[in-house]
């Protein structure tokens, strides 16, 4: 018995030692990683080298065993170089460094991250070649290196990554042949565009255009004969070339088009690894689009629940007839761009179907449906959303929208951010949906659209009156969605409550906050913990209200970017809130104390319904 106790004690000590060693080595790896960037960056404020465990640091996510599985440092104004120390994070699954100013070469040591699934280094200043070692990342599914200054050939080793689903090497200085074998056979030219020195196959190589040297040591007559023969052959080729080129073009035409527009009955067409379904498959999956499988309807069409032959559940958006007028090429280009918007907080496009009379989009089915459903149509078997879950949903949805604005190329405006379009997965994580047919945002500037799309209570004045949309349109919608999350009420209902006091929603909530009467706004399911003063909860709710107020300001330029909202949710709001309070005081003094009622013209309560789209 004593021997068994000693053995058990030894095992406990060994496990404790192992638990202490793993985080320490990861702390050292992260410190080495951080050392590559210019000092003083706010993203690393919580990265304390003396901490035994990095799992409490901002932008770091840990999995089982307290091992780092994700580094999310996109759009953090990082400058410097990516140090190779990061290879020591052997459990790392996602490395997101997009939208910074990181320079230097991509370390070949990244090829040693055996668990890596997502590598996002796009929109930086990386130079040099793509490391051949990246081909060792057998679990990699998302590789985006676009918008850098990478050069050299595309490594053939990348074609051996069987799990690769998303690839973007565009907007670099790559050269040589674009591989078409292995996993690369699924990708279209958009993945390699804007690399002027690349070509599709060896016959397009510049080296094939150089002339052949004339052999020396021949007689003058032989030379003349050679020249004459060459001239005759050249003349023959001149006449034959158009025929040969036409035959070559005709044979290769289905493969060289930007999108392969095959008939509906040939489902093997893919955009990336996006599946093309037949209409028959989707009819069988939905029992011929029966009403019993109808999940909802909106401005873009109806959504049905379906079950494929392998048993997997899907959600099918059947687009309205007015969308069918979109040309095949235009529709496929939209599908291609949206399919490349891959983020854990975005609804992943799984496939599509296109016929002369139908346009359908296929998504994974979300068992927990939408935030709106959980807030207002909770079944008897479901508990109301608690405060930690709502806080998690606020952060997750902000990350998803921020990625649409700053992580996609071209950028995407959602234009209808609301609780109904925030879906919930099996862990109640936020998944932003229904951005599938949103207008594509210009890379540098906003643009004017011809028709207002959105939902009553979620539309800012600049969009409603002038049709001018930008990323700040989504910021406004997100702010109203936060009010929905806190109150459990629809945006339209909040407009009605504010109108009773002759004010906009923004001004009404601001007044409640200033008068310490937020219990008027807060969901009855949360009032007990709010009034009970549970540690930190009351302050967290006030924080979320403050962020929502910043997002719903009347002036679009004054609203924060979504990446700033993410930072505020993670790090705090004090600096932004104080600056806004000072600005409000100055504006009030300049206006000579004009009443709040003047802002009523920003309300959309009295507009006819036909100026707005329905819920999507």
From Swiss-Prot:
GO terms for cellular component: plasma membrane. It is an enzyme of class 2 (transferase). The active site is at 416 (proton acceptor). Glycans are attached at residues 75, 125, 136, 147, 173, 181, 201, 208. SUPFAM superfamilies: L domain-like (SSF52058), Protein kinase-like (PK-like) (SSF56112). Residues 24-226 are extracellular. ATP binds at residues 295-303, 317. Residues 1-23 form the signal peptide. LRR repeats lie at residues 65-89, 90-113, 115-137, 138-161, 162-186. Residues 289-573 form the Protein kinase domain. Residues 248-616 are cytoplasmic. It is a single-pass membrane protein. Its EC number is 2.7.11.1. It is found in: Cell membrane. Residues 594-616 are annotated as: Disordered. It comes from the Eukaryota. It catalyses: L-seryl-[protein] + ATP = O-phospho-L-seryl-[protein] + ADP + H(+); L-threonyl-[protein] + ATP = O-phospho-L-threonyl-[protein] + ADP + H(+). Its main location: membrane. GO terms for biological process: brassinosteroid mediated signaling pathway. Keywords: ATP-binding, Brassinosteroid signaling pathway, Cell membrane, Glycoprotein, Kinase, Leucine-rich repeat, Membrane, Nucleotide-binding, Receptor, Repeat, Serine/threonine-protein kinase, Signal, Transferase, Transmembrane, Transmembrane helix. PANTHER family: LRR RECEPTOR-LIKE SERINE/THREONINE-PROTEIN KINASE-RELATED, RECEPTOR PROTEIN-TYROSINE KINASE CEPR1. May be involved in regulation of plant growth through the brassinosteroid (BR) signaling pathway. This is LRR receptor kinase SERK2. The lineage of its organism: Eukaryota, Viridiplantae, Streptophyta, Embryophyta, Tracheophyta.
């Amino acid at each position: 018995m004593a021997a068994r106790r000693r053995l058990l004690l030894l095992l406990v000590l060994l496990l404790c030692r192992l638990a202490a060693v793993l985080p320490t080595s990861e702390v050292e790896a992260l410190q080495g990683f951080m050392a590559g960037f210019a000092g003083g960056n706010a993203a690393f404020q919580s990265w304390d080298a003396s901490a035994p465990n990095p799992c409490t640091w901002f932008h770091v996510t840990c999995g089982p065993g307290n091992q780092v599985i994700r580094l999310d440092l996109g759009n953090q104004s990082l400058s410097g170089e990516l140090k190779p120390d990061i290879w020591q994070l052997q459990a790392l699954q996602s490395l997101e460094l997009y939208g910074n100013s990181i320079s230097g070469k991509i370390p070949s040591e990244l090829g040693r991250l055996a668990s890596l699934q997502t590598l996002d280094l796009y929109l930086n200043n990386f130079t040099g070649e793509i490391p051949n070692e990246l081909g060792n990342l057998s679990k990699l599914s998302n590789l985006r290196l676009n918008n850098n200054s990478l050069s050299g050939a595309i490594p053939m080793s990348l074609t051996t990554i069987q799990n690769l689903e998303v690839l973007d090497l565009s907007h670099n200085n790559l050269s040589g042949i674009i591989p078409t074998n292995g996993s690369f056979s699924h990708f279209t030219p958009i993945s390699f565009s804007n690399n002027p020195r690349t070509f599709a196959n060896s016959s397009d190589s510049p080296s094939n255009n150089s002339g052949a040297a004339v052999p020396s040591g021949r007689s003058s007559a032989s030379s003349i004969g050679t020249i004459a023969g060459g001239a005759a052959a050249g003349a023959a080729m001149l006449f034959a070339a158009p025929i040969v080129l036409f035959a070559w073009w005709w044979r290769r035409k289905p493969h060289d088009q930007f999108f392969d527009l095959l008939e509906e009955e040939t489902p093997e067409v893919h955009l990336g690894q996006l599946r093309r379904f037949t209409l028959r498959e989707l009819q069988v999956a939905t029992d011929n689009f029966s009403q019993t499988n109808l999940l909802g309807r909106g401005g873009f069409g109806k959504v049905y629940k379906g079950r494929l032959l392998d048993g997997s559940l899907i959600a099918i958006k059947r687009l309205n007839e007015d969308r069918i007028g979109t040309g095949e090429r235009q529709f496929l280009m939209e599908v291609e761009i949206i399919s490349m918007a891959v983020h854990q907080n975005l609804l992943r496009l799984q496939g599509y179907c296109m016929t002369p009379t139908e346009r359908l989009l296929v998504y994974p089915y979300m068992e927990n449906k939408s935030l709106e459903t959980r807030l207002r149509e909770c079944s008897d078997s479901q508990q109301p959303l608690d405060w930690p879950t709502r806080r998690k949903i606020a952060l997750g949805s902000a990350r998803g929208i921020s990625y649409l604005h700053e992580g996609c190329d071209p950028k995407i405006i959602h234009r209808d951010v609301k609780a109904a379009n925030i879906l919930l997965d099996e862990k109640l994580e936020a998944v932003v949906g229904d951005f599938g047919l949103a207008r594509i945002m210009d890379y540098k500037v906003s643009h004017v659209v011809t028709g207002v799309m959105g939902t009553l209570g979620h539309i800012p004045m600049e969009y409603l009156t002038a049709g001018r949309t930008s990323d700040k349109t989504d910021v406004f919608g997100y702010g109203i969605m936060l009010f929905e999350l806190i109150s459990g009420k629809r945006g339209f209902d909040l407009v009605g409550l504010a109108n009773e006091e002759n004010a906009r929603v923004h001004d009404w909530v601001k007044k409640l906050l200033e008068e310490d009467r937020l219990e008027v706004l807060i969901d009855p399911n949360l009032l007990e913990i709010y009034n009970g003063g549970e540690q930190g909860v009351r302050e967290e709710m006030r924080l979320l209200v403050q962020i929502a107020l910043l997002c719903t300001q009347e002036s679009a330029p004054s609203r924060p970017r979504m990446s700033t909202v993410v930072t505020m949710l993670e790090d705090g709001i004090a600096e932004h809130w104080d600056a806004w309070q000072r600005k409000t005081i100055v504006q009030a003094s300049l206006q000579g104390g004009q009443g709040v009622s003047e802002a009523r013209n920003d309300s959309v309560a009295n507009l006819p319904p036909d100026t707005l789209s329905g819920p999507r």
